[in-house]
């Protein structure tokens, strides 16, 4: 694995740390259901706090949130969907007796999920990876790709430390992944 600076030095080290399965795209939801199970596998190492996740919404979001709930149910992801302003208020007052928000007409309560401390959890992933044979090279900047002579297949990664020959490349750069192919 190549790391431009250090583990958790970028967005993963400062992101909000929320672990949830509240996504509108079905494929993302299945991936996140698996991801939540990874967090649950070692909460101590990941500094993971399984407190659940609430999406509290006004009427304008009701239909979309209902769709998310149905898709969660279809993959066996435990959640509860509360509808109607009165029922939503009662549900929230059951958790927070001083609840006062108005205009809430739906609540999606994911029973799984929660939050983790960012850098600690990413460092735990680093430790688990290296203990399973992953080599992490830090301080390596990717400059481009070496391509096969008769194809566009990637045969190496060009870095500021030289070229690394390879058979496969996996880009794990989050929303910046597209930049590697441009």
Regions found by a protein language model. Give the residues of each.
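Glycine-rich FAD pyrophosphate-binding loop
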Residues: 1-12
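Short loop/edge segments at beta-strand edges and connector loops
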Residues: 3, 83-84, 138-140
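Helical element adjacent to the flavin cofactor pocket in flavoenzyme catalytic cores
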Residues: 108-168, 172-179
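Short glycine-/acidic-enriched loop or helix-start segments at secondary-structure transitions
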Residues: 11, 65-66, 147, 180-182
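Glycine-rich nucleotide phosphate-binding loop and flanking beta-alpha elements
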Residues: 8, 62, 176-178
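Dinucleotide-binding Rossmann-like beta1-alpha1 core, especially the glycine-rich loop
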Residues: 16-98, 104
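Short hydrophobic segments within beta-strands
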Residues: 2, 56-57, 172
């Amino acid at each position: 694995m190549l790391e431009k600076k250090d583990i958790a030095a970028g967005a993963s080290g400062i992101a909000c740390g929320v672990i949830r399965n509240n996504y509108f795209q079905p494929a993302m939801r299945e991936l996140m259901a698996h991801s939540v199970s990874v967090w649950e596998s070692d909460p101590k190492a990941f500094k993971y706090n399984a407190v659940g996740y609430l999406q509290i919404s006004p009427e304008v979001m009701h239909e979309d949130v209902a769709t998310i709930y149905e898709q969660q149910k279809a993959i066996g992801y435990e959640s509860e969907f509360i509808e109607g302003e009165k029922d939503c208020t009662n549900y929230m007052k059951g958790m927070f007796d001083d609840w006062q928000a108005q205009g809430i007409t739906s609540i999606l309560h994911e029973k799984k999920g929660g939050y983790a401390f960012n850098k600690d959890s990413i460092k735990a992933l680093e430790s688990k990876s290296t203990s399973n044979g992953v080599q992490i090279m830090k301080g390596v900047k990717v400059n481009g790709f070496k391509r096969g002579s008769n194809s566009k297949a990637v045969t190496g990664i060009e870095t500021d430390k030289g070229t690394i020959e390879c058979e496969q490349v996996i880009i794990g750069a989050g929303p910046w992944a597209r930049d590697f192919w441009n």
